[in-house]
Amino acid sequence: MNAHFTTRAHRLSLILLLVIGVTALAACGPKAPAVTEVQVTLNEYTITMDKTSIPAGPVKFVFNNTGSLTHEAVLEPAGAHDEPFSLDGKESEAEEIEAGQSATLEWTIDTPGDYQLACYTPGHFEQGMFTTFTVTAP
């Protein structure tokens, strides 16, 4: 009886170790990258961001138009000027944000480099309504 108990205890111990090992290995698998949230304020002829450097990966831009005019939000490589730009397999399009309104746009930016957010409402970009930020390697 004592030998039976010892064998059974060994089996239970081995099963427990196996379960713990499998669980530990599963936890070591690749994790989805965290979404970086960036607060962006649009006002007459200015765009300000709460971050100027973000890691590559998914980004959620939360735009708040505190101005009295409608503004656009366009994401593009720094130095571009309203040129077609593909991101996430789709063209980065302008999002119009009415005065006093907010909008959320999500993109995955995998390529490190310098980017800009710009407003191309007629005359706004020319008055300095753009800002640049850096995407760093994860």
Describe these PLM feature segments.
Residues 23-27:
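C-terminal motif of bacterial Sec signal peptides marking the signal peptidase cleavage site
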